[in-house]
């Protein structure tokens, strides 16, 4: 029997290419190979359209690594997207746990609705 109930996508990304340095900058070799096909905007509306047929009703966005010093900005943007569109339901952001300002960074992320960090 095949499962046909609701599903949660526990790791996805959305972005505007202009905000993500490694997508907007000239391509360089990456450990994950050729990424030409994703060097474009992937807005939440398209994500929702892509996952609805699979029964996805909730999702968790994992950082798209906007670049140094931009993690809080990314998290705040994602929360504004969620407030407007209902997706994503959780946000996993990026914080350097070795940074001397880690406590302040974690507090700021929590206020911006981050559910976790990596």
Language-model regions, residue ranges each:
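An N-terminally biased module of ancient metal coordination in phosphate/nucleic-acid-related enzymes
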Residues: 1-79
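Active-site gating/metal-coordination segments in enzymes
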Residues: 69-118
